[in-house]
UniProtKB/Swiss-Prot annotation:
Its main location: cytoplasm. Its cofactor is Fe(2+). It is an enzyme of class 2 (transferase). Belongs to the KAE1 / TsaD family. Required for the formation of a threonylcarbamoyl group on adenosine at position 37 (t(6)A37) in tRNAs that read codons beginning with adenine. Is involved in the transfer of the threonylcarbamoyl moiety of threonylcarbamoyl-AMP (TC-AMP) to the N6 group of A37, together with TsaE and TsaB. TsaD likely plays a direct catalytic role in this reaction. Pfam families: TsaD. Fe cation binds at H111, H115, D298. CDD domains: ASKHA_NBD_TsaD_bac. HAMAP family: TsaD. It comes from Acinetobacter baumannii (strain SDF). Disulfide bonds: none annotated. It is found in: Cytoplasm. This is tRNA N6-adenosine threonylcarbamoyltransferase. Keywords: Acyltransferase, Cytoplasm, Iron, Metal-binding, Transferase, tRNA processing.
Length: 336
């Protein structure tokens, strides 16, 4: 089965072809970073308009790159949610229309399920069950993954997601968009122990809270009164986030008795986080798994793969086009 995956939940237009026999046949990705940079963040209307402009050219590029003919596509998977309504709708309409024209099934995929299953595309995928740390601009969650659609929520952020905190602190520091990678880059030349920022809720279950940390950074920046300590601020802030994510992940593994941790979402690309996770998990003889670097950020491959998992179980959508900007993963059903 060859599945076309479409990702348009935010500011990346990603398309990919997943072949159940040959694996990933090809993928293309267009990022809108330059478009939104002058605004310091994603402008939803501009994002959806740019998806409209890019979908057909990228589709043609993907078919040429992969050597697959449009008529060979067996099904279409598109991101149904969560995400920006207009951006989601462009991908959903494109995908559902294409599937209808080819007389093929289509299915809407949960964006974070795509991220969480992306490590299964690697050469050494994790086996079920495992603990998943989903960490992105919109999500910070710990879950036990028993199988496709079998997700048990252990804890989540009660306010800002980790990626959102990165972006907001970057804005406070007048760093360019996207904030997370720029903070990580600046942190390389800073001292992570220079400022003692809080680790909210560190010893309170498996939920997260990052709004207090964000406020602490704001207060410290005002105290500096123009003194340039940006590298130290970035390093200390990043260390607080990483320390919290690592310790909660270790706690989740101990609590569940599992020895496999999958980390997924845009923040999973953070090198300091990976370094600290590997060190901490080695101490408890546990293993950490990531998606391939190209599959850490938003992409069509993860949607194609997640869609395939549900399509092969017989799931597909009707003719109605549905998008769900707010969609808890705990609402997902088990394929039958």
């Amino acid at each position: 089965m060859i599945v076309l995956g479409l990702e348009t939940s935010c500011d990346e237009t990603g398309l990919a072809l997943y072949d159940s026999e040959l694996g990933l046949r090809g993928q293309v990705l267009y990022s809108q970073i330059k478009l939104h940079a002058e605004y310091g963040g994603v402008v939803p209307e501009l994002a959806s308009r740019d998806h409209v402009r890019k979908l057909i050219p990228l589709m043609n590029q993907l078919l040429e790159q992969s050597g697959v003919k449009k008529q060979e596509i067996d099904a279409v998977a598109y991101t149904r949610g969560p995400g920006l309504m207009g951006a989601l709708m462009t991908g959903a309409l494109f995908g559902r229309t294409l599937a209808f024209s080819l007389n093929k099934p289509a299915i809407g995929v949960h964006h974070m399920e795509g991220h969480m299953l992306a490590p299964l595309l690697s050469s050494q995928p994790p086996e079920f069950p495992f603990v998943a740390l989903l960490v992105s601009g919109g999500h910070t969650q710990l879950m036990v993954v028993h199988g496709i659609g079998q997700y048990e929520l252990l804890g989540e952020s009660i306010d800002d997601a980790a990626g959102e905190a990165f972006d907001k602190v970057a804005k406070m520091m007048n760093l360019p968009y996207p904030g997370g990678p720029n903070i990580a880059k600046l942190a390389l030349s800073g001292d992570p122990l220079a400022f003692e920022f809080p680790r909210p809720m560190l010893h309170q279950g498996l939920d997260f809270s990052f709004s207090g940390l964000k406020t602490a950074v704001s207060v410290q920046l005002k105290k500096l009164n123009g003194e340039n300590r940006d590298a130290d601020i970035a390093a200390s802030f990043q260390e607080a986030i990483v320390d919290t994510l690592v310790k909660k992940s270790v706690k989740a593994l101990k609590q569940t008795g599992l020895k496999r941790l999958v980390i997924a979402g845009g923040v999973s690309a953070n090198l300091r986080l990976r370094e600290q996770l590997e060190t901490s998990l080695a101490r408890i003889k546990a293993q950490v798994y990531y998606a391939e670097p190209a599959l850490c950020t938003d992409n069509g491959a993860m949607i194609a793969f997640a869609g395939y998992q549900r399509l092969k179980a017989g799931q597909h959508d009707g003719l109605a086009v549905t998008t769900t900007p707010r969609w808890p993963m705990t609402e997902l059903t088990i394929p039958e």
